[in-house]
Each structure stands twice: as structure tokens, then as C-alpha cells.
Curated annotation (Swiss-Prot):
Residue ranges of domain Beta/gamma crystallin 'Greek key' in the record: 2-40, 41-83, 88-128, 129-171
Keywords associated with the record: Eye lens protein, Repeat
UniProt note: domains: Has a two-domain beta-structure, folded into four very similar Greek key motifs.
Gene assigned in the entry: CRYGD
InterPro entries: Beta/Gamma-Crystallin (IPR050252), Beta/gamma_crystallin (IPR001064), G_crystallin-like (IPR011024)
Family recorded in the similarity comment: Belongs to the beta/gamma-crystallin family.
Protein name per the record: Gamma-crystallin D
Described purpose of this protein according to its UniProt entry: Crystallins are the dominant structural components of the vertebrate eye lens.
An individual GO BP term: lens development in camera-type eye
Length: 174
């Protein structure tokens, strides 16, 4: 079970709203979000309702302003609790529909370019666990939540291009 609290003002001030499960529309409860406290679980927060728009991965901890989660503004409109998994396994393909060279990953990778000479991934298959895909190396840039399932094209995970820099397993160990 997870727990996340959203605050309208920086430094955990102002009106707040607490969640313990997925919420597709936070707009009725908060006009803006400038700080977040994650008491338990791993969460993905989204700038738009219905889990759309830019997304940001949050682990247990305090985020006193939106820049701490690399947000560009004070808009948080939906959130999703990421289920914990014991093991993680992911297959990446250089072409759409699982074609081309394939690599399998079971650990975090800070640079796909350095480790595998890949900087574009056109399809992938999450076999176990949840992952966060980052557009840039060293866990930077746009973030995308990957849950178990098939992603035949980069549009399937919400990306606008096939650029992939790094991958991180969702593990709540902190």
C-alpha cells in the first residue's frame, strides 16, 4: 500500500490532498501542486488528467518544490501507484514489432549508448517488474512508466520519438 500527499504550496504548505491508490483526476482537489511527500510506495505523477502528459517518477521522500522531481511547472493532475515486483526483466528491440537486434536487461542501465551502443529503441517487451525509461543518459530527460506488457512502437509507451538514454527498475528500497 502506498501513500502520497500533494501540497498546493512549496515546502509542504497550503491545502493538501492525500492518495493511497491510482487517481485519474486530481483537479477537483488541487488547483496546483508545488510540493509532494511520498510516505510509502513508488509513484508516477502526470501533468494531465487520465495519466497523460509529461510524467515523473517519485520514490519515498520529500519533494519541497516541483523542480525536485524535475517538473517544469506546478501541474499535477493524476497519479499512479506502481506495484512492487520481486524481479525485473525487459527486452529491447532496435526496430518496431520486435525486429532487429534484441537485448535483455535485468538491472538498471545509466547509458544504453555506452553499454549496448543503442540510443534508439523502437519496441520493447516488459516481462517482469515495472521500469522507468528516460530519454537521456544518467536518468534524465522525459520519463515513461513501463509496466509488464508489449510495446510494439515507441508511441505505445507515450513517447514522441524512439530516443532512449537510460532505464531504471522500480524498486521501493529506500
Amino acid at each position: 500500500m502506498g501513500k502520497i500527499t500533494f501540497y498546493e504550496d512549496r515546502g509542504f504548505q497550503g491545502r493538501h490532498y492525500e492518495c493511497s491508490s491510482d487517481h485519474s483526476n486530481l483537479q477537483p482537489y488541487l488547483g496546483r501542486c508545488n510540493s509532494v511527500r511520498v510516505d510509502s510506495g513508488c509513484w508516477m505523477i502526470y501533468e494531465q488528467p487520465n495519466y497523460l502528459g509529461p510524467q515523473y517518477f517519485l520514490r519515498r521522500g520529500d519533494y519541497p518544490d516541483y523542480q525536485q522531481w524535475m517538473g517544469l511547472n506546478d501541474s499535477v493532475r493524476s497519479c499512479r501507484l506502481i506495484p512492487h515486483a520481486g524481479s525485473h526483466r525487459l527486452r529491447l528491440y532496435e526496430r518496431e514489432d520486435y525486429r532487429g537486434q534484441m537485448i535483455e536487461i535485468t538491472e538498471d542501465c545509466s547509458s544504453l549508448q555506452d553499454r549496448f551502443h543503442f540510443n534508439e529503441i523502437h519496441s520493447l517487451n516488459v516481462l517482469e517488474g515495472s521500469w522507468v525509461l528516460y530519454e537521456l543518459p544518467n536518468y534524465r530527460g522525459r520519463q515513461y512508466l513501463l509496466r509488464p506488457g508489449e510495446y510494439r512502437r515507441y508511441h505505445d509507451w507515450g513517447a514522441m520519438n524512439a530516443k532512449v538514454g537510460s532505464l531504471r527498475r522500480v524498486i521501493d528500497i529506500y
